[in-house]
Amino acid sequence: MAKKVAGQLKLQVKAGSANPSPPIGPALGQRGINIMEFCKAFNAATQEMEKGMPIPVVITYYQDKSFTFAMKQPPMTYWLKKEAKITSGSKTPGKGAKVGSITKAQVKTIAEAKMKDLNAADIEGAMAMVEGSARAMGLEVVG
């Protein structure tokens, strides 16, 4: 018989850095999920990734207090900041203050990496989403 799902929880955890301190510990603890078991499993699953990369995680927990988790690709802003070599987006995006630039080739690379998490039919649609996010951060798309 299938396990009965008690709920789902969405978190953003840095790769290889899951520990029982806030925000992970309280979020899992109040739902009765074994915190250390999640931390060990998550860190093992992300050991090959760049340490500190933010990973969105969807944790499905069951009534018997067991859980499963699915990892997604890092947020688009992470990839854009990394490609443009900036630390933060513009304080006033769309008002002429550009904080950097990104090429169409870099946009395509990000779109290919994020394709399975995006709601896009093809690579061109995914590239349009990436370009929109870049402009919203104050990045200029060139090339």
UniProtKB/Swiss-Prot annotation:
GO annotation terms (biological process): translation
PTM comment text: One or more lysine residues are methylated.
UniProt cross-references to InterPro entries, sorted A to Z: Ribosomal_uL11 (IPR000911), Ribosomal_uL11_bac-typ (IPR006519), Ribosomal_uL11_C (IPR020783), Ribosomal_uL11_C_sf (IPR036769), Ribosomal_uL11_N (IPR020784), Ribosomal_uL11_N_sf (IPR036796)
Alphabetized UniProt keyword annotations: Methylation, Ribonucleoprotein, Ribosomal protein, RNA-binding, rRNA-binding
Record-level Gene Ontology MF annotations: large ribosomal subunit rRNA binding; structural constituent of ribosome
GO cellular component: cytosolic large ribosomal subunit
Presence of the UniProt keyword Coiled coil in the record: no
Membrane found in the keyword field: no
Biological role stated in the UniProt entry: Forms part of the ribosomal stalk which helps the ribosome interact with GTP-bound translation factors.
Homology family: Belongs to the universal ribosomal protein uL11 family.
Subunit structure: Part of the ribosomal stalk of the 50S ribosomal subunit. Interacts with L10 and the large rRNA to form the base of the stalk. L10 forms an elongated spine to which 2 L12 dimers bind in a sequential fashion forming a pentameric L10(L12)2(L12)2 complex.
Protein name: Large ribosomal subunit protein uL11
Organism expressing this protein natively: Agrobacterium fabrum (strain C58 / ATCC 33970)
